Amino acid sequence: MPKTEAFDQHTNEYDNWFDVNKYVFQSELNALRKAFPKSGDAIEVGIGSGIFALPLGIKEGVEPSEEMRKRAEEKGLKPINGVAENLPYADNSKNAVLMVTTICFVDDIHKSFQEIHRVLKDDGLFVIGFVDKNSPIGKSYLANKDKSVFYKDAVFFGTEELLKILNKTGFKINNTYQTVFGKLDEITKVQDVLSGYGKGSFIVIKAQKK
């Protein structure tokens, strides 16, 4: 069952977060740009309001939240009503797939990754951006998830855990990147993007279809 209720009811709150935390957003976007290809037939799974898709040049994707789809359409994007576990795309049809802060909301992460593997062309790229549950911000989200409109039903993952799932579902790992260091309310400038993981709270994994 898609976890869409919070996003349908609190669409403005979701979009406003990126305005309030503009340096965090820009840092995350810079990390994604290091991993995501600049051209090719790409989609975003969990495109939301298009906050990441638009600057990354992605024009379409799937999104189960009706209100989020409306926001994406207003930006000229083409969101399709769908979920990660059952993608409405042909086999071997996409050069790249993006998922940003979406993995914590899927019902079945293994099936989701298998579906992404199916729609990717040979050697296609799968780029994931997420908050590591073992990071400072991840631990804060976990500790306060019952109070959060968006995260109360979320399932968080650690980087090592995701790397193992990617390997099991037919992907090899090309690179990992990290950014967002420290507490959210203490970030007052765009932060560096470093290779690897273990220090930053926002992690980007660049994987490739085997």
Where are these regions (language model features)?
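Short alpha-helix
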Residues: 153-176
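Conserved class I S-adenosyl-L-methionine
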Residues: 1-39, 51, 125-156, 180, 187-188, ...
